Amino acid sequence: VLSMPRNLGFLEACPNPPFYLNLFLSVSKICNISFDNQNKIGINVLIAIIGGPNKGKSTLFNALTLGNAAVANYPFTTIDPNRGVAYASKNCPHVHLNRQCNPNNSKCEEGVRKIPINVLDVAGLVEGAHEGKGMGNQFLSDVAASDCIILLADASGSTDLDGNPCTPGSNDVLQDIEIIETELDAWYLDVFKRNALKARGKKIEDFANLLSGLKITMDDLNYVVRILELNPQDVWSWEKEDMKEASKIIRERTKPIVIAANKVDSEFAEKNVLKLKEFYGKRYGVFPIAADSELALRKANEKGMIKYNGKTFEITTPNLPSQLISALEKINKNIIEKWGSTGVQALLDHCVFTLLNQIVVYPVEDEVHFANHFGKVLPDAILLKNGSKSIDLAGKIHSDLATHKLHAVDAEKKMRIAKDAVLHDGQVVKIVSTK
């Protein structure tokens, strides 16, 4: 079973796969077979996929991670959160350096560096979740640790607000978003109220410490105090409406959202995507996606049946079964030709590089050969907040390196980097230290 030809893997995406495929998949899950044991240093971004029940969250998760999250056409298929690794993409500097890279904490495919990103697929959220309805309490706790949110809407309008199948086009896609927003804001307000009571009579720094589990910082609180002209000495004294507005602003600031309009190959998708863009485009951004098509293409690519670059594909295996060729032609016509791509990779890259404002920097020890001390060229791709300096890069690699840092060198220019200089995207940097 374990020596089953790899090109049969695409049959996973087909109905009624043969018994030996199911057996192979079962064995691989039980044995936890994995081909990715890389040491992912410097990678700490977490993206949460949220939405109502049965909107396609687990399919998107699987498409991003090539995971095996349960997928079914009924509510609350996901009970425990699924965790996995997806890969954001950036052009790798090895191309213009004319050196072959040797990635350690990432991958490189045809000149594109793939940087690992943590992804979380959580249980579907329904109205009343902040009061514990459905999987509400677990859902909101899972979201707390995330850095940004992909909010999934069903562009086909074929699932109701509770996740039950309904007549395509009958569900109002705007309500997919409104309910989630309402529940998030209600939950944040409740958290603020409870912790404001705990911080009664204390400094705002104490309030910030109580909210740190939501990745809320003192800078965030100072921001909201300033724009709403609130009293920083006593959070408990804030008026009810001020508390509500403050918690909403903090939620939007610390958990940026992008909307993914899923199932764009459906009859009503184009109308619903336009509707979402009209109401939410300026505020959140809306990405039309086809998660199931992305999953099928990635599995076919993994098995060597097609060559897929995240946008377009070409068939590389001769004599494919007619049903598979037909499925691929349908994806090409209904998704790629119409929408330009499945939208999934663009969605992930938007989260990392736009919503979270990250850049990629490549630390090396040998600035002549752009390598580490083992001679590996551009081994690590490190994500940093745009505006970071060399001391931030040193700390991301190891706290001791930051402590003993002397200076940094731009490996391409062979010039020392000023202490207060801001690093730029794609920069190759050597950190010089006393150790």
What are these regions (language model features)?
Residues 8-11, 20-25:
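Short hydrophobic targeting helices and cationic amphipathic motifs
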Residues 35-133, 137-164, 169, 174-175, ...:
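Conserved G1/Walker A P-loop phosphate-binding module
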Residues 138-288, 294-296, 304:
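Conserved C-terminal guanine-recognition region of P-loop GTPase G domains, centered on the G4
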Residues 266-362:
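Canonical P-loop GTPase G-domain recognition
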Residues 376-388:
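Short, contiguous acidic and Ser/Thr-rich linear segments
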Residues 406-422:
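Short acidic beta-strand-loop surface patches of small beta-rich interaction domains
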Residues 433-435:
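Short, charged beta-turn/beta-strand-edge "cap" motif at the junction between a beta-strand
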